[in-house]
Amino acid sequence: MNTWKRYIGGIALILGLAVLPHCGFGETSAVPEVRGIVLTGEAKQDYIKTQMDALYAPPEDKEPVPFTAPEGWGYEKISIGNVPVERLAPPKPSSNQVVLQLHGGAYMSGLTDLYRTFAVRQAEYTNAREIYCVEYRHAPIHRYPAALEDAATVYQGLLARRTKPSDIIIYGDSAGGNLAVELAIYLRDEGLPQPAALILLSPWADFAHKDGTSRTENFTKDKVLGKGTPFAPHLRSIPPYAGGLPLDDPRLSPIHADLSGLPPMLIQTGSYDLLLTEDEVLAAKAAADGTPVTLSIYPEMPHVFPLVLPELAESFAAFEEVREFVNQYMTP
């Protein structure tokens, strides 16, 4: 049976891939119907490689097609405190929940259609009435703390719009996962109310490259960040967003930060993820600091797999886990 490891409050459990946990230990929800493409072994890795080659291929020389939201959805480009934001809203929301999306891209790239499409799924599985995608400033022009300032501005703007903090979910992947944790730390230190939950997909938790970790052990396995990808030549470089800060500064690398007093975290990663080790360290640090945390490791899956491989069964399972996590921690 495929398994992944989960940490809840520092307690590790091994669960089957088809079984999603309920909110109590020793209980499980019914085995859900398997959805998505099911692949194993070499067939799965070959498929992932093919999909990533297509994703990273140079764009065709033709006029890009503007993003179109699904039928019935609201979609608008707005500004909150001078920060560009894109707002998506499903046609028939059944809750007051709001998602603040912090996109990935190594703090080097802006919002793309990949993330707009991802936002639709994020809204669906979190039962959100609206989702705000933040177009924060990024390197190399803008360095720390530009992205954090923009994320904090939008969060406080949502509060000013009378959005309850208990209705807010911060959802970040990769660099956006880093930003989500750093935003929560900033809110705590400034005495501002915390969101209800943090959902972190393959968060970038350590700016320093360390040999002998998944950064090297998964280099040939991770088809999203590893060998043969556009990111591979830069993995040992100093991230431009760091500016003049040491790479182990807790403002850059949350594995070195005080993680007490933060909202419940769901950390999802893959056993082939280049950032697996630091995600494990982040989960252990959060648990040690008293923050409720769940770490799920999906077998043989790469970095940010639900974002770039949404059609696979593991991605459907990851989104179902998000749904259950949100149901557990959001106030009815």
Model segments located where?
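N-terminal Sec-pathway targeting helices
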Residues: 1-11
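Bacterial N-terminal signal peptides
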Residues: 11-19
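Bacterial Sec-dependent signal peptides at the C-terminal "C-region" and cleavage site
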Residues: 19-29
